[in-house]
Regions:
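Sec-dependent signal peptide cleavage junction
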Residues: 17-37, 156-166
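Non-catalytic, surface beta->alpha helical segment in thiol-disulfide oxidoreductase systems
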Residues: 112-163
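Bacterial Sec-dependent N-terminal signal peptides
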Residues: 1-22
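Thiol-based oxidoreductase modules, predominantly thioredoxin-like and allied folds used
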Residues: 34, 76-101
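A short beta-strand-turn-helix
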Residues: 35-53
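Loop/turn elements at helix/coil->beta-strand transitions in domains of secreted/extracellular proteins
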Residues: 50-55, 85-90, 114-116, 123-125
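Structural alpha/beta surface segment adjacent to cysteine/selenocysteine redox centers
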Residues: 95-115, 124
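Conserved redox-active cysteine motifs that mediate thiol-disulfide chemistry
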Residues: 58-74
């Protein structure tokens, strides 16, 4: 029996050390090294030239709701088209590696609403709306209907006076 225990222990250690682990690769939609202000400046210039607004998604690779939103938009052609047609998009990182504090301060500390949080800037870079994403959720994800309504209500054309006659 004394000889059997070391053999079993050795076999156990060997099997554990050779066991394959299948870990899901980390999702990286946000770039902690990105210059957020420069990205916003480029998006604002493009938006102004194209009569669009800027859609900023603030979050991080650590945030499951941020990933879910990103995946939903990319997997739903109608949402992707609506976003691309009406907005210049910026993914603004907030993480321990880079909290982008100066940029988020200028944007009125949107993280107070949780993550992801969505910001709409006009073609001059002025913040015109901050959206708590919780209001766009349904069940364990976001609602396509609610997101569609949100994006339609804050696009460039929706805010033109001629489109708002009562």
């Amino acid at each position: 029996m004394k000889r059997l225990i070391p053999i079993i222990f050795t076999l156990f250690i060997a099997s554990v050390s050779f066991a394959q682990t299948t870990t899901k690769p980390a999702v990286t939609i946000y770039n902690p090294k990105a210059n957020a202000q420069a990205d916003i400046d480029v998006a604002v210039a493009k938006a102004k030239a194209a009569n669009k607004h800027v859609f900023i998604q603030v979050g991080g690779n650590w945030c499951i709701w941020c990933i879910r939103f990103h995946d939903l938009v990319n997997a739903t052609p109608a949402l992707k088209e609506l976003l691309d047609k009406n907005y210049e998009t910026v993914l603004l990182n907030w993480s321990p590696e880079n909290k982008n504090e100066a940029v988020l301060k200028k944007l009125n500390y949107p993280g107070r609403f949780g993550f992801p949080v969505f910001l709409i800037l006009d073609g001059d870079g002025k913040l015109i709306h901050t959206q708590n994403s919780a209001y766009l959720e349904e069940g364990s994800g976001h609602s396509v209907k609610k997101i569609t309504e949100f994006l339609k209500n804050w696009n460039y054309a929706a805010l033109l006076p001629e489109n708002n006659k009562y």
